[in-house]
């Protein structure tokens, strides 16, 4: 692979966001070089394992990793089902070696269209027992939730939970669609929910989890600054909002950065941050006994 630079510092601007980009699609272009190095299933397995090892180094005890096998397969035309198998194996290796508990979430990359996403779903279903949830990510504006209703029905029928990227590049109606058409119990980003009081009421009444991503939302120009992020308002309203990293390698962050630097800059007090962490445990895709075991481990 011919890289655009021959030093880590020279390569960094091509694979990380160095400053705010115009929009989400500009942010997503940073993935191109990362996907380029996934030349075969062995590379996919290694990356999956190293993600778990990185989490251990960060002091993380429980990790939910999400991946789009179709996207990972595109650069070198790898069999999509083999990508799923490789990720499952790599995560299992990493978990055994580190003791980090990991759950996998399959992503349908909406930007490739409904037909490609159906192929992606079929590949994910070959390892249905190793996944806990199905996600929809990518170009929210041009590929709305209604295109993927059948995909998510099949996912729910397989026993998976549903989390959907919505309310980031799209408005509050995109969040409504994720909830009502796809059956989401968690929403990634959900920034635009603040524009719709009825939606805010619904999120509270139905205990919908919100996966907030502070640094990422500033970098993608979803919000103009950390201070303008609605996370504090979500928490003050009693919503099940949490603090996440989104794409940590592209954003150049770790969870500690979000908790210790980004969250205070967004107006969160230590009490807000503790509540967000309690919310994270509540909405985690874990069985009650698994949550209890995790609490006992970190006491």
Predicted regions and their residues:
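Metal-cofactor-binding active-site regions of metalloenzymes
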Residues: 1-160, 169-174, 181-186, 192-209, ...
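Short HxH-centered metal-ligating active-site micro-motif
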Residues: 165
């Amino acid at each position: 692979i011919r890289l655009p630079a021959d030093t880590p510092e020279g390569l960094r601007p091509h694979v990380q966001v160095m400053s705010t980009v115009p929009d989400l699609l500009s942010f997503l272009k940073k993935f191109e070089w990362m996907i380029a190095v996934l030349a075969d299933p062995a590379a996919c397995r290694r990356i999956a394992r190293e993600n778990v090892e990185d989490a251990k180094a960060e002091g993380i005890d429980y990790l939910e990793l999400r991946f789009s096998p179709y996207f990972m397969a595109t650069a070198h035309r790898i069999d999509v089902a083999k990508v799923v198998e490789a990720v499952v194996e790599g995560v299992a290796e990493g978990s055994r070696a580190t003791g980090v508990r990991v759950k996998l979430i399959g992503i349908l990359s909406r930007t490739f269209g409904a037909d490609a996403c159906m192929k992606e779903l079929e590949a994910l279903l070959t390892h249905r027992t190793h996944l806990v949830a199905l996600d929809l990510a990518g170009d929210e504006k041009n590929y709305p939730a209604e295109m993927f209703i059948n995909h998510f029905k099949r996912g729910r029928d397989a026993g998976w939970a549903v989390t959907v990227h919505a309310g980031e590049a799209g408005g509050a109606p995109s969040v409504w669609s994720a909830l009502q058409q796809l059956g989401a119990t968690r929403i990634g980003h959900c920034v635009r929910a603040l524009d719709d009081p009825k939606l805010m009421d619904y999120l509270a009444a139905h205990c919908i989890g919100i996966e907030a991503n502070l640094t990422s939302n500033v970098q993608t120009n979803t919000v103009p600054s950390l201070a303008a992020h609605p996370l504090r308002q979500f928490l003050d309203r009693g919503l099940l909002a949490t603090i996440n990293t989104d794409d940590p390698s592209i954003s150049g962050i770790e969870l500690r950065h979000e908790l210790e630097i980004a969250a205070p800059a967004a107006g969160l007090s230590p009490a807000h941050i503790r509540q967000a962490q309690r919310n994270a445990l509540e909405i985690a895709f874990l069985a009650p006994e698994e949550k209890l075991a995790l609490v006992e481990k970190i006491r």
